[in-house]
Amino acid sequence: MKIVIIGASFAGISAAIASRKKYPQAEISLIDKQATVGYLSGGLSAYFNHTINELHEARYITEEELRRQKIQLLLNREVVAMDVENQLIAWSRKEEQQWYSYDKLILATGASQFSTQIRGSQTEKLLKYKFLSGALAAVPLLEKSQTVAVIGAGPIGMEAIDFLVKMKKTVHVFESLENL
């Protein structure tokens, strides 16, 4: 059996591990547009609070751990088409595109950040650190900034507010709900 999972965040990885337990002989593939898996979105907080030395340590699982479980990782790939009738998906990476067959398909594409829907949010000054690549880009900008606006006061936003205040930054909080 060939199991393909689109999305390699919490749900996708959980589905891959559960599938491996239930179907030990299956060929299992995780497809994701990110370059890495297992990054904890609270990694910046852990880094700036000196709980970890490098952002790469903010992981709940590594690529190697998944490979040891015989789970194939197809990273830096974006699914661009599906042919459900013939059980095929197409993924692309740079100039390359390939069709990939499956017996079972699991969609685990996860949540998206609301900030991407804000007009002007594509500026380099708006930091999004749900993924490791964004967190790595955020570190030098946060270190040199004196004033920071945090959009969203959910758990990750509150962690950001905490470490930014400890860094002696002026912090402005924008939250759509009435209470924090």
Please state what every model-predicted region is:
Residues 10-14, 35, 111-113, 133, ...:
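Residue-level detector of alpha-helix initiation sites
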Residues 1-4, 59-151, 172:
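FAD-binding core/adjacent interface of flavoenzyme oxidoreductases
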Residues 14-18, 134-137, 159:
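Residues within well-formed alpha-helices
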